Design a protein with these regions (language model features):
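Short, structured patches in soluble enzyme cores that scaffold and shape functional sites
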Residues: 7, 110-112, 126, 137-147, ...
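Catalytic-pocket segment enriched in acidic/His residues
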Residues: 9-10, 50, 66, 70-72, ...
Length: 272
């Protein structure tokens, strides 16, 4: 099952794609997270999923991938709570930086002010008057938490996962390097593209390997596989839940693979 939010002349609302059918959820069931949290335990059975959608007023928009991919997507969650990010979580990325892989997850935080949806303009620091031009990209698999987690086992963590989406941790490197903490290079307003689709865990397996690709003006600048992760999604969620309660709608970005970030710096004319 795939979840998303769209916006058109009728406003914004949630949609889902299940068994080649596109369903539109009524406005009363939006935002998406509220609907999912209410019924998540029943979505494991396909028959239950269809029944729940119909019983709650979901209507069929049509069928097929072509229709789904043509929808006017916006970011899938309006206001995520916590955004926890893992650094150095790909072996090839650590190697290209001449660093050892961490013994424990290297974590930092983002805030919702940084997020934008698909197709939105990244607010470049140079355009804000800071003069910074050392901006580049980090494509990442992002976990969307679907249920509360505290001191969770890896199995419990996966059971609480709503699904997977994509995030690009666009970073301002000169500001990031001003201290040993990465915070100020990672939290600029409107610099982190997120979404558009949340894919349920039964459809993909990051441990087996999902390809991550980042293109700048149609040129591939990063290509990696989630099979290269140091800490798996289950391990990250379980680890974080040992010291912090994760709530529905929280995001965990799982790190970025190696790539070419230095030959071209991102500017407002580029398409990421």
């Amino acid at each position: 099952m795939r979840w998303a939010q769209i916006k058109d002349s009728k406003g914004s609302r949630a949609v889902c794609f299940f068994e080649e059918t596109v369903y539109e959820l009524p406005a009363k069931l939006s935002p998406l997270l509220n609907f999912y949290s209410r019924f998540r335990l029943n979505f494991g059975d396909p028959k239950n999923a269809v029944a729940i959608l119909k019983e709650n007023g979901a209507t069929v928009m049509g069928h097929g991938e072509e229709l789904w991919n043509s929808l006017p997507f916006i970011r899938p969650l309006d206001k995520p709570g916590k955004i926890v990010c893992a650094g150095l979580n790909y072996r090839d990325h650590a190697a290209e930086m001449n660093l050892e892989v961490p013994e424990h997850p290297a974590l930092f935080a983002k805030f919702p002010n940084a997020l934008i949806g698909p197709g939105e303009q990244i607010r470049m620091p140079a355009d804000d008057g800071t003069g910074s031009t050392k901006v580049d990209w980090e494509v990442e698999l992002c976990l969307v938490v679907g249920a509360r987690l505290r001191n969770a086992t890896e199995e419990q963590a996966l059971d609480a996962l709503m699904g997977y989406t994509v995030m690009n941790d666009v970073s301002v490197r000169d500001w990031q390097g001003r201290s040993s903490e990465w915070f100020q290079g990672k939290n600029w307003d409107a610099m982190t593209p997120f979404g558009p689709v949340i894919v349920s865990p039964d459809e993909v397996d990051p441990v087996a390997g999902l390809e991550l690709v980042c293109e700048v003006d149609d040129v591939v600048r990063q290509r990696g596989t989630t099979a290269d992760m140091v800490f798996t999604p289950a391990q990250l969620l379980s680890y974080i839940s040992r010291f912090m309660t994760l709530e529905p709608g929280d995001l965990v970005a799982t790190g970025t693979p190696a790539g070419d970030r230095k030959s071209t710096r991102l500017n407002s004319s580029h398409r990421l």
